């Protein structure tokens, strides 16, 4: 696959940002363009630079497509990640307008706040656990829009892993050695999905460290 030229990279990145601002994501993929995952990463990074230049702030990262089945479906060989933006971080109890999103979808997740920057050469499960300041139940919001052809991995990456925001719950101190918990996603008082008997930290963290 031919690498994008600098002009193509800049053009696609500006269109991705314009689409984000107009709440109409991923219009460039309606033309069924084909780009590599590597170029999609470059687009995400270029859009990040544009957003930073206008005053937006990256506060963290999301990790997705952890399971091998999902990676295969998306055309990945490893998990995907995207940036978390300060103005898209919402507190528990917030009221959000559906009109600010495009085909919004939600996932119940666990999020962590780190107490230090991570040194890649030192990363293992024990190091990660010692680096956790607080643990939070969260709701991640996606703009669930794919206009291109499958697999959709490059489209997902170019659109910041289709991340559109996160609602963060109350904190729990991170020095938990072992605990079993449940996680539920409830919409209009109806349980949409549930995960029972999840063991912290192994069911939440170890797969991400190993991948």
Annotated model-derived regions:
Residues 211:
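Glycine-rich phosphate/ribose-binding loops and adjacent secondary-structure elements
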Residues 2-206:
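Catalytic-core "active-site belt" of small-molecule-metabolizing enzymes
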């Amino acid at each position: 696959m031919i690498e994008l030229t600098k002009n193509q990279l800049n053009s696609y990145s500006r269109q991705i940002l314009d689409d984000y601002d107009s709440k109409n994501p991923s219009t460039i993929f309606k033309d069924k363009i084909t780009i590599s995952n590597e170029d999609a990463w470059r687009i995400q990074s270029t859009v990040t630079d544009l957003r930073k230049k206008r005053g937006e702030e990256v506060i963290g990262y999301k990790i997705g497509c952890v399971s091998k089945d999902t990676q295969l479906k998306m055309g990945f060989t490893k998990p995907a990640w995207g940036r978390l933006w300060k103005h898209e971080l919402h507190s528990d109890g917030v009221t959000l307008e559906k009109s600010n999103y495009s085909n919004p979808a939600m996932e119940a997740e666990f999020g962590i706040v780190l107490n230090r920057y991570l040194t890649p050469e030192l990363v293992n499960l024990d190091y990660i656990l010692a680096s956790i300041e607080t643990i939070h139940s969260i709701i991640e919001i996606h703009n669930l829009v794919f206009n291109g052809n499958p697999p959709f991995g490059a489209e997902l990456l170019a659109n910041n892993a289709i991340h559109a925001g996160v609602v963060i719950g109350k904190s729990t101190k991170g020095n938990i050695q072992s605990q079993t918990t449940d996680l539920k996603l409830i919409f209009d008082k109806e349980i949409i999905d549930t995960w029972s008997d999840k063991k912290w930290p192994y069911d939440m963290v170890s797969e991400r460290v190993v991948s």
